[in-house]
């Protein structure tokens, strides 16, 4: 029994994608996914482009963004094949919110599209061999969406009227995915956080760091790496389905992985929050808080 416990865990296989991971033309059963960034750029040229020293992400209002896309989280820089690129448009991994409108817009935005994070992985035998991966979080999948929504709801319920900080972390899921001998060198990139600063006279718990919470999001990680042309086409279709804008349909089976919120935010704040009519609206451009940075606002250092 001890020997069985020591056996390495098998990595997810692409065979599951071709045999049923794409449930229908409108829904996909994918929680988390990993693929080389270079492969993502080739499969999604409308959403990402390398231009000089910039990694250009489709902005709200552009034709490519109207067809879907991803919410890219980062600190302004990404390292690909040993070269640093500046992100043209992204959501900061840490933001400060000061009122309910900021909170509502932030919540709607991060759940409106799949999340995308950049990580670098090295082999312990040869640290010079580094590969950049794109980590995808399917916010339309009910299991993933539930963890994020419940995390936000629970912290609000426990600190009503007080300031707090909430972080979502995917490091454990990703590190368990890679086999022994591989190391994620910038694991902190696999998290994002927001800090809600309330106008409270005595905010003792916040002052002493007692209102900081961390939600470790878990889920099945799909391996979307492939050199097969046939499977690359399948992966391309898979990514397009995952990131397509929400369209309401008459069939319940087509709506079961809907991105529309079930109203938990209403229960917490007791106010009317209606879902947006379409995810083609420029969500990021409407944000009143400084969460979206342009490429000129590059931080001074990169981890």
Curated annotation (Swiss-Prot):
Keyword Membrane belongs to the record: no
One GO BP: positive regulation of fat cell differentiation
Tissue specificity note: Highly expressed in the visceral fat depot.
Keywords: Cytoplasm
Lineage: superkingdom: Eukaryota
Protein name: Mesenteric estrogen-dependent adipogenesis protein
Subcellular location: Cytoplasm
Main subcellular localisation: cytoplasm
GO terms under cellular component: cytoplasm
Organism: Homo sapiens
Functional note: Involved in processes that promote adipocyte differentiation, lipid accumulation, and glucose uptake in mature adipocytes.
């Amino acid at each position: 029994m001890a020997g069985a416990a020591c056996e390495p865990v098998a990595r997810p296989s692409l065979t599951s994608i071709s045999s049923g991971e794409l449930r229908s033309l409108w829904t996909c059963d994918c929680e988390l996914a990993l693929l080389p960034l270079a492969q993502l750029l080739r499969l999604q040229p409308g959403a990402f482009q390398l231009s000089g020293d910039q990694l250009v992400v489709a902005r709200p209002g552009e034709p490519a963004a109207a067809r879907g896309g991803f919410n890219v989280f980062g600190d302004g820089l990404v390292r690909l094949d040993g070269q640093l690129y500046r992100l043209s448009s992204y959501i900061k991994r840490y933001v400060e919110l000061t009122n309910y409108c900021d909170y509502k817009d932030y919540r709607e935005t991060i759940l409106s599209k799949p999340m995308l994070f950049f990580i670098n992985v090295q082999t312990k035998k040869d640290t010079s061999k580094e590969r950049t991966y794109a980590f995808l979080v399917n916010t339309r999948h009910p299991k993933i969406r539930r963890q994020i929504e419940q995390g936000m709801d629970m912290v609000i319920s426990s600190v009503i009227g007080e300031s707090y900080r909430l972080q979502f972390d995917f490091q454990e899921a990703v590190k368990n995915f890679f086999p022994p001998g591989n190391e994620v060198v910038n694991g902190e990139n696999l998290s994002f956080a927001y800090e809600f600063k309330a106008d409270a006279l005595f905010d003792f718990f916040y002052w002493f760091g007692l209102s900081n919470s961390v939600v470790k999001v878990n889920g099945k990680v799909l391996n979307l790496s492939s050199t097969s042309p046939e499977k690359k086409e399948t992966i391309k279709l898979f990514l397009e389905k995952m990131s397509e804008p929400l369209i309401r349909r008459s069939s319940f089976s087509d709506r079961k992985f809907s991105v529309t919120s079930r109203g938990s935010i209403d229960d917490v704040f007791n106010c009317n929050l209606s879902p947006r009519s379409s995810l083609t609206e420029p969500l990021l451009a409407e944000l009143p808080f400084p969460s979206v940075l342009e490429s000129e606002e590059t931080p001074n250092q990169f981890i």
